[in-house]
Amino acid sequence: MLYCRSGFEKECAGEIQDKATQLEVYGFPRVKKNSGYVVFECYQDGDAEKLVKGLDFSSLIFARQMFAVAAEFEALPSEDRISPILAELSEFESFPRCGDLRIETPDTNEAKELLKFCRKFTVPMRQALRGKGLMWNKDNAKKPVLHICFVAPGHCYVGYSLPGNNSQFFMGIPRLKFPADAPSRSTLKLEEAFHVFIPRDEWDERLAPGMWGVDLGACPGGWTYQLVKRSMFVHCVDNGMMADSLMETGQIKHHMVDGFKFEPDRKNVTWIVCDMVEKPARVAHLMGQWLLKGWAKEAIFNLKLPMKGRYDEVLQDLENLKMFLIENKVKFKLQAKHLYHDREEITIHIQCLSNISPH
């Protein structure tokens, strides 16, 4: 089972079909429009386990969470929902002993009405699972996570995900607060990107105070705000006006020029970030150029998606960008994600692993 943004089930299904085929796991996706989830039915027993072990979760763009389904209950009796789940899981010899329980729903308005029930149900369900030896007596982040996903009252999927190959967040969504002094809500996109793409223990080194960043298409400064908050200096490139609160920090230089033509005068930039409303292929190529020229070491940028053929567009743009870097002998690490705070767009992170002198 995979969670995704409502309206992106088709893209999520296309992606899991492709990835499963690459691992020689065969099946078909069950897709319900605007449901916020996709169920991939494997033809052979044991293949769901094969997928959650062998398919790198971080390589999935449109999935927020991934877990192997052990059972589906379509009509749990309201007077006792716990016993049928315990009975079914006890039959599964391969079901792992779990260290955490998440009782969730897909991210739709209808399903989220069940969240209050999910919270109340968690404590008795956890106690019952521990009593049966299906969960460890103490929470353990190094053990599998047991998921119970309610898609409607009495209708749920039960399964598990593996630590290190799942989303660490409940429902696959990081809980971020909008900072009152940020100039726009887009600030949460970049903050979420840092959480998703950069391991927390590397923040001090890779998002260090005193670094220089460039923000293309910066105004009014939602993304710049995240860099300034981390005590970086920023070249803000936009013909529009920047928020006064950011200008007053003394940490930013505002360049009123076209983002596609800007070149930093001093080549001491670590980060390039970009959230421009432009053709995705054009933005992806521009980011490749910045890394190839050694103008930046890491990039986070958004690609706006077309109305139709979104998955194909994403595959094409990413493939072209990878080929451009490979042909120019640039070593890199690339990850793409349809973030919770993204709408008709995806966010890409590239870390350049080659030591390139700026030119």
Curated annotation (Swiss-Prot):
One Gene Ontology cellular component: cytoplasm
Matching Pfam families: FtsJ, RlmM_FDX, RLMM_N
Alphabetic keyword roster: Cytoplasm, Methyltransferase, rRNA processing, S-adenosyl-L-methionine, Transferase
Gene Ontology terms: biological process: methylation; rRNA processing
Catalytic activity of the protein: cytidine(2498) in 23S rRNA + S-adenosyl-L-methionine = 2'-O-methylcytidine(2498) in 23S rRNA + S-adenosyl-L-homocysteine + H(+)
EC number: 2.1.1.186
Enzymatic class: transferase
A single MF term (Gene Ontology): S-adenosylmethionine-dependent methyltransferase activity
Annotated residues for binding of S-adenosyl-L-methionine: 186, 219-222, 238, 258, 275
Active-site residue list: 304
Annotated compartments: Cytoplasm
Family annotation (InterPro entries): RlmM_FDX (IPR040739), RlmM_THUMP-like (IPR048646), RNA_MeTrfase_FtsJ_dom (IPR002877), rRNA_MeTrfase_M (IPR011224), SAM-dependent_MTases_sf (IPR029063)
Main location: cytoplasm
Role noted for this protein: Catalyzes the 2'-O-methylation at nucleotide C2498 in 23S rRNA.
Family: Belongs to the class I-like SAM-binding methyltransferase superfamily. RNA methyltransferase RlmE family. RlmM subfamily.
Record's subunit section: Monomer.
Record protein name field: Ribosomal RNA large subunit methyltransferase M
Organism this protein belongs to: Vibrio parahaemolyticus serotype O3:K6 (strain RIMD 2210633)
